[in-house]
A protein has these predicted regions:
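Amphipathic helical "hinge" segments at domain boundaries
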Residues: 2-77, 162
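Hinge/beta->alpha junction and helix N-cap segments in small-molecule ligand-binding domains
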Residues: 25-35, 53-62, 114-125, 141-188, ...
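Flexible loop/hinge segments that line or gate small-molecule binding clefts
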Residues: 57-58, 80-128, 146, 166, ...
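Periplasmic-binding protein-like
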Residues: 74-82, 139-141, 173, 195-206, ...
Length: 296
């Protein structure tokens, strides 16, 4: 009896499965992305597959560096959620390594499978909820312009207003970068408008920007939700710890990470025509950061 640990790479090669995969993800300080990464790592580990993790800062140099790193590690495929896809060349470089699965985004013009949530439905429903509270002056702290996920969430907010009889073109729109600081700065601008123009509800494209907006309001003596209602998107753990707790849309980050790995494994074994899963369902979570507007 030879006591030995079977080599995972050899075992996976024997069964025609990946032995190492890459994960390109942005902003691990954001609890959504860290939960997604945990889903990827846990699911890969269940199959004895290693994950090479690359975190990016949304620059072309970082994207190219990640492609070089993953090539040097001889990964068998890549899960990609960097949010920076103006540099399509780096994605083509990644495709040369093996299958590429997008998660939480789609890229027009590139035929890449993706694992996403139904964010448009989520923002549509949460916007309708806020309108039903009596709000009429809205602003949206949207994500980066020209990003598919950001556009879907903005479209849902606009549809929700229209479904409740409001004119979506009247909603002020400012684009942030999904980080807390941009939510803070945009809220500072919006809440500094003349009172007759100031929004009574801020619809944010993610929780981090919503938290930044809430922090600006707290530091400036603006009461949430008495003076302004604020909603987010993701339902990161921090959203439940705020005071007031954040009304938001919950999307299943961990399960999306798992789904991306499962799709990648299927592609490595069966070829590139594997069918992506249907969009993951989302849930509107009503908490204390939204209420009826103050009577004028």
């Amino acid at each position: 009896d030879l006591n030995y640990i079977q080599n995972a790479s050899a075992r996976n090669l024997k069964r025609q499965m990946a032995s190492t995969i890459g994960l390109v993800v942005r902003d691990l300080d954001n609890q959504f992305f860290s939960a997604l990464a945990r889903g990827v790592v846990d699911t890969a580990a269940d199959q004895g597959v290693l994950v090479v993790l690359c975190s990016v800062d949304n620059s072309e140099q970082a994207e190219s560096g990640n492609a070089r790193l993953l090539r040097s590690q001889q990964v068998d495929g890549v899960i990609y959620d960097s949010g920076f896809h103006e540099n399509a060349r780096s994605l083509l470089e990644l495709q040369a390594l093996g299958p590429v699965v997008l998660v939480d985004e789609r890229i027009p013009g590139l035929d890449l499978p993706s694992v996403v949530a139904d964010g448009r439905r989520g923002t549509r429903e949460i916007a309708r909820h806020v309108v039903k509270l009596g709000h009429k002056r809205f602003a949206c702290i949207a994500g980066p312009s020209a990003h598919w996920t950001s556009e879907q969430r903005l479209a849902g907010y606009r549809e929700g207003l229209a479904m409740e009889g409001l004119e979506p073109d009247q909603m002020l729109i400012r684009h942030g970068d999904y980080k807390l600081e941009s939510g803070y700065e945009i809220a500072k601008e919006l809440m500094g408008l003349p009172k007759s123009e100031r929004p009574t509800a801020l619809l944010c494209a993610n929780d981090m920007m919503a938290i930044g907006a809430m922090e600006y309001c707290r530091s400036s003596g603006i009461a949430v939700p008495a003076d302004v209602s604020i909603v987010g998107f993701d339902d990161i753990p921090m959203a439940r710890l705020l005071s007031p707790r954040l009304t938001t849309v919950r999307q299943p980050a961990y399960e999306m990470g798992r789904g991306a790995v499962q799709l990648l494994f299927t592609m490595t074994q069966s070829g590139p025509d594997a069918t992506p899963p249907d969009p993951f369902a989302v849930d509107v979570v009503i908490r204390e950061s939204t209420a009826a507007p103050r009577a004028e």
